[in-house]
């Protein structure tokens, strides 16, 4: 079936917007946090008055918390809650889309699109120890998560379950090469990247 958003907006749009961001960050190392808290809240207002093709708004909230477990280095429980909502004449390419290497890993990016999306992930990260009790360069992760999408908050439909495992190799101090295998509902994804997903 043809996508109504694609039929309305096509694949080419120019959009200009103004907005604001509030951010708080107490993470020890942003690209590979072992402890701390992160909050990012933003609102962006796009309009034809700025030379764009569409009038719409995007609101986002990203909350992350990191805990050290078992009183040892390299043992971290990371959690994330993210909400994204849009209103107005939202272009096809600006709809919320899970499935990137930084959210519900395991879904195909663009397979699901809607104006609103919310998801949560909990991930355990473990770096192995050497015999001398210093951290090695290798580690593993495992995560569970899920989310939902809809045209409005009161119209969310279905649940996108998510889980996965991964391997980490430290290429620089506290900067990892990331290999992840994620599963969604009847979908699978493989990810090769640097730094943690969140």
Set out the residue ranges of the language-model regions.
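Transmembrane beta-barrel wall of Gram-negative outer-membrane proteins
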Residues: 1-7
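C-terminal outer-membrane beta-barrel translocator/porin domains of Gram-negative envelope proteins
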Residues: 7-11, 18-134, 192
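Outer-membrane beta-barrel "beta-signal"
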Residues: 19, 169, 187-198
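Short, contiguous acidic/charged loop-to-helix segments that flank catalytic cores in large enzymes
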Residues: 107-113, 152-156, 182
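C-terminal hydrophobic structural anchor segments
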Residues: 125-160
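ATP phosphate-binding glycine-rich loop and adjacent ATP-lid/helix-beta elements
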Residues: 164-166
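Low-complexity, intrinsically disordered Gly/Pro/Thr-rich segments
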Residues: 173-181
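A short, acidic, flexible beta-alpha connecting loop/helix-capping segment that sits on the rim
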Residues: 181-187
